[in-house]
Regions:
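OB-fold and OB-like single-stranded nucleic-acid-recognition modules
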Residues: 17-160
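Sec-dependent bacterial lipoprotein signal peptides
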Residues: 1-17
Length: 160
């Protein structure tokens, strides 16, 4: 009886380590911005994230043009240049400083799709889903760590 109880406690503790931040928890529609742009999904509650393309402060709100990527278990966007789920625009009341929310920072939004907006990407007309964001979650910058491996000081392999 003690072993299963200990195993259960360890499982619960380990699961707590990989949880989502509280503002990003909840039930959300499972489709991507690309899928939303192909059909009308107005009113759906979504949790999308990705990398910032540009930030547009307006008189009463701030809009973010985003490249969407898949979200991990913690709702943080994966960082992969070729893994895109389309683009979207997320707007939130208030001022968000473009110096802090700079290009390529990772952000996760929750909110409701309020409509669609046509914008140009180069010469291409792109249909952006527009999200009225309830939560704007800016993730910390990922630190790059250079791992340096040095050869062993002895001429044979192994630790002995």
């Amino acid at each position: 009886m003690k072993i299963p109880l200990t195993a259960l406690a360890a499982t619960v503790l380990l699961a707590a380590c990989a949880s989502q931040p509280r503002p990003l928890q909840g039930e959300f529609a499972p489709f991507t911005p690309r899928e939303a742009a192909e059909s009308d999904r107005t009113g759906a509650v979504v949790r999308w994230g990705g990398r910032i393309v540009q930030v547009e402060p307006q008189p009463d709100s701030t809009c973010f043009e985003m490249i969407a990527t898949r979200l991990g278990v913690t709702a943080r966007p994966y960082w992969a240049s070729d893994d895109t789920g389309g683009r979207f625009i997320a707007c939130r009341t208030g001022f968000y400083d473009p110096a802090v929310f700079e290009k390529n920072r990772e952000v996760t939004f929750t909110g409701r799709i309020s409509g669609y907006e046509m914008r140009k990407i180069g010469a291409y007309d792109y249909r952006f889903p527009r999200v009225d964001a309830d939560v704007v979650y800016l993730w910390p910058v990922r630190e790059q760590v250079d791992v340096i491996t040095r050869p062993a000081p002895w001429p044979w392999w192994g630790w002995w």
